[in-house]
Amino acid sequence: MMGYQSNFQPKLFYYNVNLDQRVPQNHSLRKINEKIDFDFIYKEVRDTYGINGNVSIAPPVILKMMLILILYNVRSERELMNTIPFRLDWLWFLGYDLDDEIPNHSVLSKARTRWGVAVFKRFFERIVWQCIEAGLVDGSKLFTDSSLIDADASNNSVVDTYSLKRHLNKSYRRLEERLDDLKVQKSTPANSRYISTTDPDASVTRHSGGKSKLRYKTHRAVDAKCEVITATHITTGSVDDGDVLREMIEIHEQNTRKSVDTVVADSKYGTIDNFLLCHKLGVKAHIPSFEKTHRGSGRQKGIFPKEAFSYNPDTDTFTCPAGQILKRRNYHKKRKHYEYKAPSKICVLCELRERCTRSKYGRSLKRHIQQDELGRMLAYARNREAKRDIKTRQHLSERSFAQSKRYGYKRARWRRLWRMEIQDFLIAALQNITVLIRHSEEKISKSNAQIGQIIRTQRVKWEDFSFGSLLMRLFNQFTMALGLV
């Protein structure tokens, strides 16, 4: 018989409503609550609060709200606060009841300003150390990469600092003071000349021939064992990847308390300075050479590479494919290399000129003052182990960034560099928490499987000595004694 729903009449009071019973045992927030201790933040932010005045929202609750904001990729903090009363799982995670008052959305922005970046950095470091204690981090091999993040600002907010000062009004006094500090010259790069009035820390960046946008850049170090993020760093989008390798190694060693043995990265990190840095630190650099990777493009297409020239250490000269001698001419102090050249009048008459150089001054080569050490590092970067690590990096690092997309990392939630650092620490911490929970569940499943195997083994042994088995053995012995078998 079909049933009909009666007219809904809301109850004035609800009895025996237990939020803990409403949240499933396998809920992600329940797992996070079991694994992570949020009470540490009381000690971290104690000095940022006074002893008088109104009582604030509990710091662990604020941190949990920010995690929910990232975990569920909620569009705004205002929307988060409006949604919390309707989500029983969020209420349970935050320690609220059905009729508790939800704080204003401004609580989160004020907390970020009050706490600063250091608190969120400490939270990320605690999660990394928790992964280390769980045996999920090896720490000896460092995989590093970077990715661009769109700033929360439009290209229309970019202004030219040359013409801006003539049109500034009273509301732009702060920006004018900032421009005076920059001391911009006409020969400076574009990001020193152009600035966004909405987000001054973001830089105009173009990626892979696409459109120029205001962007930041996140640099990330991932451990190969369980893909735990051991270090993360935010810069403006114009910073080269290779310039932060030293800092990434230092952050990784500080967070893991382990020395790096091998660094694996793409060719953007394969600069001479980075190879020599790894040599100085005693670290193996499994990094493709930037020069060799991008060789054969542009003006260098179809030109003899440096390896086609033979170096004679006795005479300190190079010999070109045509047999001509290139002698040492100049020393570049800033780049720390010598320049070797052949006479231009010889290059002009050479039959191999079209394949050797397009310069009217003839072919020139550069040799670093630490070329011997550099050559050994480049040789290490071409061995079989290095090629295998470079191939592993392609999917390991890209997968880490791909997982971040579900948390909205491709676009900045807030403006200014220090707020971007907070967003980056929260996303990286959440990814590590996910790894921690997943491997804990796998460990429990493995233990349960082992226990089940032991029970099945003991059951088989018990069945071997059961009463029915004993009768069968006696019957077989009896028939054999009578000669019936």
What are these regions (language model features)?
Residues 25-67, 72, 369:
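Basic, short loop/linker segments at the boundary and entry of helix-turn-helix/winged-helix-like folds
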Residues 5-6, 73-86, 96-485:
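Anion-binding and metal-coordination hotspots
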Residues 12, 25, 38, 58, ...:
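Generic alpha-helical segment signature
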